[in-house]
Amino acid sequence: MVNRISILGSTGSIGVQTLDVARNLNIKVDGLAANKNIDLLEKQAREFQPKIVAVKDEERARILRDRLSDTDCKVVGGVEGLKMVASIETVETVVTSIVGIAGLIPTMEAIKHKKNIALANKETLVTAGHIVMSEAARMGVKILPVDSEHSAVFQSLMGNNKKDVAKIILTASGGPFRGRKKEELRNVTLREALNHPNWSMGSKITIDSATMMNKGLEVIEAHWLFEIPQDDIEVLVHPQSIIHSMVEYKDGSIIAQLGSPDMRLPIQFALTYPDRKQNNFSKLDIVKIGSLTFEAPDLEAFPCLGLAFEALRAGGTMPAVLNAANEKAVGLFLQEKIRFLDIPEIIEKVMGRHSVKPDPDIDDIIDVDLWARKIVEEIVK
């Protein structure tokens, strides 16, 4: 179990739940970082008394510095500030829960300083999986998944030989629009899309769940995290969100991890691994649930999942383009500037215009990220 952590993205859904876990386990929080929510960040800093607090927005960092002047917290700003929180000397594990590609640079900084990573920012592996995993191996750093699905796969692989794996089965809730046909999705509202049936999450990931892009990004993440060929990764819709994912072995055995749909469980396991600790979270009552069901995903109604498989197959810079186009399109949908079904159409158009660079470095990934966002703006004009 870790004793000291930093949290990148402490004011978001995962960050808040990580602090709940830290509170329960008496884990010391030495660093906190957020994008711009300084009201919540100030409360967190006063409770946990970290050494360093970072705000990506420089102006808000200045405001928070004044507010926390009566404490010993050092307040820093910008991307450099995030990098400082990622590399605090006393910290053993950095929890990376910043939304989007913004998490890539501070995650790489943490790896450079030999910090283990509790990874909740899937976009880091989606855009730069080949770089991140190879650098983590070189530095002897553990990447422990926080996503419930990848935590489930990680746990289902424990004690088994990876060469015996036949396939990984990622489960998806199906989101708020499960069972609807494409035509029925034409006029869905932002409010409907944000109404997830099982999980409490941030707005971006909730929309990704509604389009099934979240599962697509998780397929790419699983490919890098577990070194599994994409043809050996399957997605099943499991509306109850009780089985978080499964691993099928070559003898036909399937090992699955079950639990309540509570993100604090995979967060806690990433922080206590290889141990398990008592907690006060609600326990799973299987009898009460009664039955578990599964169905194949509808790729016609939810084309984002298929686009993610295509991007992984194309390789190189294509997953970064998929991710950037999706981030931009989801942002526009959250502002109610485009319709729900415009999201996959925009992503497909951007991917269609991209010439893949096969073995990109970080600069290439940042370049294509900016390029893809610009193309989305052109398409939507």
Swiss-Prot record:
Listed cofactors: Mg(2+); Mn(2+)
Chain positions recorded as Mn(2+) binding sites: 147, 149, 218
Reactions it catalyzes: 2-C-methyl-D-erythritol 4-phosphate + NADP(+) = 1-deoxy-D-xylulose 5-phosphate + NADPH + H(+)
Short name of one Pfam family: DXP_reductoisom
EC numbers on record: 1.1.1.267
Coiled-coil intervals, chain numbering: none
Binding-site residues for 1-deoxy-D-xylulose 5-phosphate, renumbered to this chain: 122, 148-149, 173, 196, 209, 214-215, 218
Gene Ontology biological process terms, A to Z: isopentenyl diphosphate biosynthetic process, methylerythritol 4-phosphate pathway involved in terpenoid biosynthetic process
Manganese among keywords: yes
Keyword annotations from UniProtKB, A to Z: Isoprene biosynthesis, Manganese, Metal-binding, NADP, Oxidoreductase
Disulfide-bond pairs as recorded: none
Recorded superkingdom: Bacteria
GO MF annotation list: 1-deoxy-D-xylulose-5-phosphate reductoisomerase activity; manganese ion binding; NADPH binding
Annotated metabolic or biological route of this protein: Isoprenoid biosynthesis; isopentenyl diphosphate biosynthesis via DXP pathway; isopentenyl diphosphate from 1-deoxy-D-xylulose 5-phosphate: step 1/6
Binding, NADPH: 11-14, 36-37, 121, 123, 202
UniProt keyword Protein biosynthesis, yes or no: no
InterPro entries per record: DXP_reductoisomerase (IPR003821), DXP_reductoisomerase_C (IPR013644), DXP_reductoisomerase_N (IPR013512), DXPR_C (IPR026877), DXPR_C_sf (IPR036169), NAD(P)-bd_dom_sf (IPR036291)
Family recorded in the similarity comment: Belongs to the DXR family.
NCBIfam families recorded: Dxr, PRK12464.1
Entry protein name: 1-deoxy-D-xylulose 5-phosphate reductoisomerase
Record gene name: dxr
